[in-house]
Amino acid sequence: MARYRRHSRSRSRSRYRRRRRRRSRHHNRRRTYRRSRRHSRRRRRRRRGYSRRRYSRRGRRRY
């Protein structure tokens, strides 16, 4: 039991840190765009232009 607990703890900690960073960055970006209507309109147009594969690849590399 002790060994299992230690292992899960270390794993969860590393995962939690990574998830926390990603979430905070996304949340901040959403807030800024939501406040101004101009930004939201621009973002919608850009998203439609980009292909899904390209967008996902860029997101993965950045974060």
Swiss-Prot record:
Any GO BP: chromosome condensation
InterPro entries with a match to the protein in the record: Protamine_P1 (IPR000221)
Subcellular location(s) per record: Nucleus; Chromosome
Nucleus as UniProt keyword: yes
Keyword presence, Transferase: no
Cellular-component GO terms for this entry: nucleosome; nucleus
Chief location category: nucleus
GO MF annotations in UniProt: DNA binding
Keyword terms: Chromosome, Developmental protein, Differentiation, DNA condensation, DNA-binding, Nucleosome core, Nucleus, Spermatogenesis
Disordered, as annotated region: 1-63
Taxonomic superkingdom: Eukaryota
Known tissue expression: Testis.
Functional summary from the UniProt entry: Protamines substitute for histones in the chromatin of sperm during the haploid phase of spermatogenesis. They compact sperm DNA into a highly condensed, stable and inactive complex.
Family to which the UniProt record says this protein belongs: Belongs to the protamine P1 family.
Protein name: Sperm protamine P1
